């Protein structure tokens, strides 16, 4: 089954570039956001966020009629959810936006559709999302209950750096975590529409943990570099020279201090 129409739920720093890249490949893309100002801005061929090269891709896609935005989900062949997952006051992950997005698309789901969660989420979130969808649509079979589902579900985290998103979306490898191997294969087919990197397939829980591991590795490196700067300041050592020298070690240079 081909992907004639793709819906992206959440038109922020990940959702809008993703929608624009799919549209640049000639796919009909419907972006959905509760922010009416963002929707109106995009439909004028402009952008409401700052990201190099995004403006021209969005403008061209809107002018061709391949990209449009709305505040309400519509029927599509694939749905990508890219909404915020902030922390609550007690530092617990807040999945209310994911739940709201899932419930918003549930009425328009049909047999053969693909639903992908891209938001950074705790392990088990994709399964939870699938449960919300199944509860809302008992007439459809989902992968947690049936080996031959009507709706395919996967977790495919973004792996891009702000300021380089339009390049890295296309060139970086993509972790594809389906709830079943068939879900992974279906999600890989979707991303291959624009992806030049490799689709690396795994299960949803491993993909969720992979994204958290990548973020944690970055955070640990930042904290380590900060500690080095404090020590170097106390010892009258140039921290940048130190880092450049340390990165010449073959085992350290691979990770980059």
Question: What function would you assign to each model-found segment?
Answer:
Residues 1-254:
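Structural/interface elements that position substrates and couple domains in central-metabolism enzymes
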């Amino acid at each position: 089954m081909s992907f004639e129409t793709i819906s992206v739920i959440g038109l922020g720093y990940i959702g809008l570039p993703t929608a624009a890249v799919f549209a640049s490949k000639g796919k009909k893309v419907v972006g959905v956001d509760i922010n009416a100002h963002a929707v109106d801005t995009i439909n004028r061929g402009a952008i409401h966020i700052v990201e190099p090269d995004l403006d021209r891709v969005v403008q061209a896609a809107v002018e061709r009629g391949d990209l449009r935005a709305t505040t309400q989900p519509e029927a599509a062949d694939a749905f990508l959810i890219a909404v915020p997952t902030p922390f609550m006051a007690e530092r617990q992950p807040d999945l209310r936006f994911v739940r709201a997005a899932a419930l918003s698309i549930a009425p328009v789901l049909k047999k053969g559709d693909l639903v992908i969660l891209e938001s950074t989420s705790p392990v088990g979130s994709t399964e939870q999302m699938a449960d919300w969808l199944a509860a809302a649509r008992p007439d459809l079979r989902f992968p947690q209950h049936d080996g031959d589902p009507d709706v395919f579900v996967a977790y495919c985290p973004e792996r891009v750096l702000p300021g380089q998103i339009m390049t890295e979306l296309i060139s970086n490898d993509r972790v594809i975590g389906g709830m079943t191997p068939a879900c992974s294969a279906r999600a890989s087919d979707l991303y291959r529409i624009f992806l030049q990197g490799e689709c690396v397939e795994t299960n949803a829980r491993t993909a969720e943990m992979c994204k958290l591991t990548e973020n944690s590795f970055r955070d640990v490196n930042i904290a380590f570099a900060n500690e080095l700067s404090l020590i170097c300041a106390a010892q009258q050592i140039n921290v940048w020279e130190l880092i450049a020298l340390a990165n010449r070690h073959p085992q350290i240079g691979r990770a980059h201090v």
